[in-house]
């Protein structure tokens, strides 16, 4: 399959149709704005093949954030992973250029990675998850070695599953770089 804008558009349409078609009462938010028990994830399960999976939404810990996804771009990296899996991640929830609204957060979450206050209802984006020094690039742009970092949308699948923005919800974990973009 040749990867071009028409192919990507068709893939996105198929994923969105699958997510809409698989909606269940458990994963649909109630009119009161309550958080559903499950979320849908467009999981790349084989080369050039997505399955819409439904997973329980994990409990939000003291340092975690649950975000309702509002949108996500399709990057060339997503297309490369879809076509060739160069990172050996399958199965994987792709999507690393997304944004959404905080619907629940742990009691220890007070500020984003730039020091801006955050609260439920704020719009956020993610960047890297630094395993070593989370401030590696925050204050010195000459320090661009991100070899010890992970990216949502390019994380191996685990027991959380909500690791990419191609989903209803994304689960942002302690140590993640995220920014409040509400303004």
Label the model's feature ranges:
Residues 35-42:
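Short structural boundary motif marking the start of a folded domain
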Residues 42-50:
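Extracellular beta-rich ligand/substrate-recognition surface
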Residues 56-72, 85-138, 182:
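Glycine-rich beta-strand-centered segment in the early N-terminal region that forms part
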């Amino acid at each position: 399959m040749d990867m071009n804008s028409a192919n990507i558009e068709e893939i996105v349409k198929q994923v969105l149709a699958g997510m809409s078609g698989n909606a269940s009462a458990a994963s649909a938010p109630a009119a009161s704005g309550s958080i559903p028990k499950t979320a849908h994830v467009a999981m790349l399960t084989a080369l050039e093949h997505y399955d819409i999976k439904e997973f329980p939404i994990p409990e939000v810990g003291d340092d975690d954030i649950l975000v309702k996804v509002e949108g996500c771009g399709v990057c060339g990296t997503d297309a490369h992973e879809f076509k060739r899996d160069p990172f050996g991640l399958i199965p994987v929830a792709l999507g690393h250029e997304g944004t959404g609204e905080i619907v629940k957060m742990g009691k220890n979450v007070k500020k984003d990675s730039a020091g801006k206050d955050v609260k439920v209802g704020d719009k956020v984006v993610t960047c890297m998850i630094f395993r070593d020094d989370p401030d590696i690039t925050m204050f010195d742009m000459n320090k661009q070695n991100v070899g010890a970092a992970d990216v949502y949308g390019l994380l191996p699948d685990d027991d959380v599953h909500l690791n990419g923005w191609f989903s209803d919800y994304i689960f942002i974990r302690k140590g993640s770089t995220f920014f409040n973009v509400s303004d």
